[in-house]
Amino acid sequence: MAKQKQERRLPAAEAMCKVRTLRTSPRKLNLVAQSIRGLNVQRALNELEFSHKRIAQDVRKALYSAISNAENNHNLDIDSLVVAEAYVGKNLIMKRFSPRARGRATRVEKPFSEITIVVRELGEAA
């Protein structure tokens, strides 16, 4: 028995990409997400290409995926795409222990985060 087709959550002129496990804190990832919000996709790719932040390359891959989804799945024109939304969420926190003096140990938390990028096609009027 086949799965029933779900209704589309986004409007017709939008495409989305979601990356679930990025090994950085949401606070650091949000700095990169803020830098591309509202930009043309070509300009956003340039921003991410020359960013000094380590996580920017992973965000760049996600943006390429959103652009490919728009082009291949939704037949949108990639020259008129804009990053409509780029938002960040918390994910799991890996807990590790670090040895300290006198036989003690402290907990080290290694956070993961997730990012959702939505690209929108601008009409001719815009």
UniProtKB/Swiss-Prot annotation:
Gene3D superfamilies: Ribosomal protein L22/L17. CDD domains: Ribosomal_L22. InterPro entries: Ribosomal_uL22 (IPR001063), Ribosomal_uL22_bac/chlpt-type (IPR005727), Ribosomal_uL22_bac/org-type (IPR047867), Ribosomal_uL22_sf (IPR036394). One of its GO terms (molecular function) is structural constituent of ribosome. The keyword Zinc does not apply. Keywords: Ribonucleoprotein, Ribosomal protein, RNA-binding, rRNA-binding. PANTHER family: CHLOROPLAST 50S RIBOSOMAL PROTEIN L22-RELATED, LARGE RIBOSOMAL SUBUNIT PROTEIN UL22M. Part of the 50S ribosomal subunit. This is Large ribosomal subunit protein uL22. It comes from Caulobacter vibrioides (strain ATCC 19089 / CIP 103742 / CB 15). The gene is rplV.
